[in-house]
Amino acid sequence: NDPAQNDAAGQIAERTLAGLWRLGAFGLQVPCELGGLGLSNTQYARLVEVVGAHDLGVGITLGAHQSIGFKGVLLYGDERQRARYLPRVTAGEYAAFCLTEPASGSDAG
């Protein structure tokens, strides 16, 4: 991974993302039985901190995928929802979060 190259290109290199998927980095807190690594909050935070210290864009990508992306399903989804969605977001499908605020602005972009 080359953070300067990622910044210049405005995106993270595909080979970096592919390597992170192979390592399980997109499912850090998902339970092992659903395809994740099953890390605790402390382990998750420390790992994203270390990654972000090297390349903030990669750290933010991992964090967004696992926080606003699928954290709601992880914390509040029923067993059927967890079994349906969590294996997918640990095996190569990016999680998404949609936001609309027609009368205000969070500047989420």
PLM regions: where:
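Glycine-rich flavin
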Residues: 5-109
